[in-house]
């Protein structure tokens, strides 16, 4: 069947993938029902896609998922859409290893048999830009069908690039040329872009502008034409365990906590969980629930506000269900962040550092039954944080880290029977026990 799809891949990081991919999604959304995707484990870029398309963007990751799972997850979310735009990660071929493509944009493109549009930084380049494209085309068996030249300087620069392409690569479509433009910049910080909940109105306005600029400089009809290819469907691929058990889950979601995979919520709902969102910043108490789920984010930027909300802190302390905290959520339920008092459910504190403390795909094994898995089972995830825990008096950890760092001594997931919290970020496919364990733990 036809399932229109295209990967927007870069020759490297910092070539404009997120801005241009999001702009393409926004521009196409005027005529089409668009599904966005991000290659890799990033939380923030998909929230930009979601604003652009009105559909929840998803992650596709060949470390988290095998080829069939990538195809099935894509099929699940794209089957009722007109076209899918998949934003790559880093350079097209960058993955976790120097000698294979696991974790790379190329691996996802190959799993989906998707055409690729290559985004090239053309600053001060003409013939050399063509050499780069030819190298990318010959390196592996991927389908590079078009190119976008970013950071072009002048009409003369554009003419030279056109001449070089027509001479050396006449069969590759030129999708367009984007000039050096301050409007194509996006604000970032240590964990990536600024999350959309922090400055929603301004980011929405930027995305509208990116869509207008893409319409001006790129050939959208060529993008749709390139995307128009057959897709080989797959049937009944295992994504995650389903062991239905009705539970109410309160999920922290606001400016401080917004790092979530929407597929985790899908997996929880398939296991009959009912999800209700609340704000540790603005609300006075946790909703009526069986489980409290506090995901990642930037609590360090809002630590004073979080600390001032004494009613919420007391509500969390008095919560009589199970609590799961992930990275930023872990930090929040320690005694303090940079000496600013927090919830204090865990006997340790969090401090921010100037250097990354964990940046890795993770392989782990459960040491005991807990809120997100069962003893002896292995799972995957990722970690990315600049904080670390100090004055750790906790001695019980739910999982050992086989690849990655964890909290201390290759251990992660502080666990006291009621509270589980760690630095490892879970995706429901990479940890297929996540949702079923959460709704069934303790029974």
Swiss-Prot record:
Domain notes: Comprises of two domains. The C-terminal domain contains the binding site for glutamine and catalyzes the hydrolysis of this substrate to glutamate and ammonia. The N-terminal domain is anticipated to bind ATP, and cobyrinate or Ni-sirohydrochlorin, and catalyzes the ultimate synthesis of the diamide product. The ammonia produced via the glutaminase domain is probably translocated to the adjacent domain via a molecular tunnel, where it reacts with an activated intermediate.
Pathways involved: Cofactor biosynthesis; adenosylcobalamin biosynthesis; cob(II)yrinate a,c-diamide from sirohydrochlorin (anaerobic route): step 10/10
Biological processes, Gene Ontology terms: cobalamin biosynthetic process; methanogenesis
Domain GATase cobBQ-type: 248-433
Gene: cbiA
Protein's UniProt name: Cobyrinate a,c-diamide synthase
GO molecular function: ATP binding; cobyrinic acid a,c-diamide synthase activity
Superkingdom, taxonomy of origin: Archaea
Residues forming the catalytic site: 327
Keywords, ordered alphabetically: ATP-binding, Cobalamin biosynthesis, Glutamine amidotransferase, Ligase, Magnesium, Methanogenesis, Nucleotide-binding
Cofactor field: Mg(2+)
Enzyme Commission code: 6.3.5.11, 6.3.5.12
CDD domains found in the cross-reference section: CobB_N (cd05388), GATase1_CobB (cd03130)
Gene3D superfamilies registered for this protein in UniProt: P-loop containing nucleotide triphosphate hydrolases
């Amino acid at each position: 069947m036809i399932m229109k799809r295209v990967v927007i891949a870069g020759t490297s990081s910092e070539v404009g993938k997120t801005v241009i991919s999001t702009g393409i999604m926004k521009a196409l959304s005027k005529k089409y029902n668009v599904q966005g995707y991000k290659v890799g484990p990033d939380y923030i870029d998909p929230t930009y896609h979601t604003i652009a398309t009105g559909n929840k963007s998803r992650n596709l990751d060949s470390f988290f998922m095998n080829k069939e799972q990538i195809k099935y997850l894509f099929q699940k979310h794209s089957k009722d859409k007109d076209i899918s735009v998949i934003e790559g990660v880093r350079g097209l071929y960058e993955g976790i290893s120097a000698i294979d493509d696991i974790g790379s944009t190329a691996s996802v493109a190959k799993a989906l048999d998707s055409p690729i549009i290559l985004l090239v930084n053309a600053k001060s380049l003409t013939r050399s830009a063509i050499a780069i494209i030819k190298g990318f085309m010959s390196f592996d068996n991927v389908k590079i069908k078009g190119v976008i030249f970013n950071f072009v300087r002048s009409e003369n620069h554009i003419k030279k690039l056109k001449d070089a392409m027509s001479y050396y690569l006449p069969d590759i479509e030129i999708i367009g040329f984007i000039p050096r433009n301050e409007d194509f910049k996006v604000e970032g910080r240590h964990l990536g872009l600024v999350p959309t909940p922090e400055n929603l109105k301004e980011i929405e306005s930027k995305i509208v502008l990116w869509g207008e600029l893409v319409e001006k400089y790129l050939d959208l009809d060529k993008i749709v034409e390139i995307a128009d290819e057959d897709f080989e469907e797959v049937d009944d691929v295992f994504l995650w365990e389903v062991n239905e058990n009705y539970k109410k889950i309160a999920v922290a979601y606001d400016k401080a906590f917004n790092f979530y995979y929407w597929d985790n919520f899908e997996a929880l709902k398939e296991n009959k969980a009912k999800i209700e969102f609340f704000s540790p910043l603005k609300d006075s108490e946790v909703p009526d629930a069986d489980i409290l789920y506090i995901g990642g984010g930037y609590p360090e930027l809002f630590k004073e506000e979080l600390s001032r909300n004494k009613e919420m802190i007391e509500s969390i302390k008095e919560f009589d269900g199970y609590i799961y905290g992930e990275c930023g959520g872990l930090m929040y339920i320690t005694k303090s962040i940079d000496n600013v008092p927090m919830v204090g459910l865990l006997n340790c504190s969090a401090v921010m550092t100037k250097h990354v403390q964990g940046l890795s795909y993770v392989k782990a094994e459960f040491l005991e039954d807990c809120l997100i898995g069962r003893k002896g089972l292995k799972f995957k995830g990722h970690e990315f944080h600049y904080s670390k825990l100090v004055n750790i008096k906790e001695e019980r950890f739910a999982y050992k880290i086989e690849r990655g760092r964890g909290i201390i001594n290759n251990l992660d997931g502080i666990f006291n029977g009621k509270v589980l919290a760690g630095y490892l970020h879970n995706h429901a496919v990479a940890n297929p026990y996540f949702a079923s364990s959460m709704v069934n733990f303790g029974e």
